[in-house]
Amino acid sequence: MSLESILVSSIMTKKVIVQTDNQTIQAISNTMYENNIGNVLIIRNYVAQDSIKQDKVVGIITERDVVRIVGSFDPTLYHLPVREIMSKPIISITPTCSLRDAMETMQLKNIRRLPVIEPEGKLVGIITSRDLFKIIINNQDTMSTFINSNLVPLSGEFYERFTQYWSDDILHKTR
């Protein structure tokens, strides 16, 4: 099994938690806590040309964003609309992209999550670096392909995340 043969659609998480861009960081933080997740995709409702109401992914809030806000010790930020502090523009990938495409995008953009959006704009899932690591670690062929691939040289942070996940996985299996 090669990195190019595994499609994003086969490993993405299909249940994605979203909130509208008028929510506060406090509301988003509560959503993250209640759902035990590290990010929330931010959507904006709009009316398409055919007068059908649709949602468009316009940003993302991650646990890092929340820590940055809380760490500022400025309680007024908790009540700002999330659209003022979310990461944007959104970097996404399509469901037909390969695992290799997802890895390269994450590494080049220095991100850990990619919303999976169909070409016509419909959100269908999310893929994380953790999802990618899990596939690589749990399949010898994929691990071998990954190690021997000519991927863009791994950045320090990407390599750290991979080795951290790998060591956590090994520790978990030995308990």
Regions found by a protein language model. Give the residues of each.
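Short acidic, glycine/Ser/Thr-rich loop/turn "cap" segments at secondary-structure junctions
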Residues: K88, I111-L114
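The conserved cystathionine-beta-synthase
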Residues: Q19-I37, I42-R44, I93-N110, I117, ...
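A glycine-centered beta-loop-beta connector
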Residues: M32-N35, V40-D65, M106, L114-R130
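Tandem CBS (Bateman) regulatory domains
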Residues: M1-K14, Q54, V58-T94, S98-Q107, ...
